């Protein structure tokens, strides 16, 4: 995440998917943060088979979530909405099946019952889609 006024030149030797959202940092989030997801420890999630890696130390929730095969989560609502990008595998809920590369945007107070039969890793951002 790059604060206003900063710059960068992204590159990749082998190609990649670059997920970019501009202009979303609050006044209290102006410091650049870097998380090395190859070395950061995964933490136990709220149900067996779920592990999480928080990506922001403050503010809204940005998290990597790893689902082991045949992991099921409780039905729940999202205060402030939720965005999901499926990094690998297949993520599912009662609304559909979302393979790697899928993006899901669910509005404030949306509800679902997520699971993954095959296993997956997703990027999740929550709480930033409040109604104006």
Residue ranges of each PLM-predicted region?
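Ligand-binding loop in jelly-roll beta-barrel domains
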Residues: 3-28, 108-132
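Tight coil/turn sites that cap or link beta-strands
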Residues: 5, 68-70, 101, 107-109
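Short histidine-centered beta-strand/loop micro-motifs
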Residues: 10-11, 64-65, 74-78, 95-96, ...
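A short, N-terminal "cap"/entry segment at the start of jelly-roll beta-barrel domains
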Residues: 13-59, 132
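Regulatory nucleotide-sensing modules
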Residues: 55, 72-75
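A structural connector/turn signal
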Residues: 62, 81, 93, 109-111
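Glycine- and acidic-residue-biased ligand/ion/polar-headgroup-sensing regions
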Residues: 68-71, 78-94, 100
């Amino acid at each position: 995440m790059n604060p206003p006024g900063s710059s960068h030149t992204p590159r990749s030797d082998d190609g990649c998917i670059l997920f970019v959202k501009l202009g979303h940092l609050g006044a209290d989030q102006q410091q650049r943060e870097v998380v090395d997801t190859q070395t950061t420890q995964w933490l136990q999630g709220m149900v067996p088979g779920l592990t999480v890696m928080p990506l922001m130390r403050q503010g809204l929730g940005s998290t990597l979530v790893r689902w082991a095969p045949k992991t099921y989560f409780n039905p729940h609502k999202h205060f402030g909405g939720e965005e999901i990008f499926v990094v690998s595998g297949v993520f599912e809920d009662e609304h559909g099946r979302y393979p790697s590369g899928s993006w899901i945007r669910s509005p404030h107070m949306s509800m679902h019952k997520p699971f993954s039969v095959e296993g997956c890793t997703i990027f999740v951002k929550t709480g930033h889609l409040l109604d104006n």
